[in-house]
Amino acid sequence: SNQFDIRIVSDNPITWATSTGTCAADSSCGWYIDLDTEVGEKMVANPILRGGRLIFVTTTPSLEACDAGGSSWLMEIDPYTGGRLNFPVFDLNGDGVFDFNDNLASTDGGTTTYTPVSGKRSKVGILQPPAILAGVGGAGDGGYGGAEAKYSSGTNNAQIDVTIENSGILRAGRKSWMQVK
């Protein structure tokens, strides 16, 4: 099944500087992500900057004191704003195509809004940062770009989490140049 827990980050506007050129101590400049610190969620590995996306894994330890396990989220956001991407990253409906149908639909007051998803919860425990394989087959682009696979080892019985994702603007393949004399 392609069902998994999802996260959506905001796309609030960013204040990069004030008219005085300084920022208050209340973090009024730049962006941050408010992780679920009540349960101890942290980012403990370096993020990956790839194709205009910031890719990272968060980790939440188990609530049981003697349990070495926990859970993780695989997140993909805009590195410049800290907000969600403007295209679907995850194949929510499992049809092998990244398109409009992979956004989260929500209705409020008769108006339906479609929002790209920013993260997915691991089903294999705590994840390591993913190894990324670009140009994987089997997923059409739906006008949003090609597909890539993210492989992360989990703490549950050494299982591997495989996520086929939209690579967005990143185009894999041979890069070449010509020397001009």
Predicted regions span which residues?
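Beta-propeller fold recognition
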Residues: 1-181
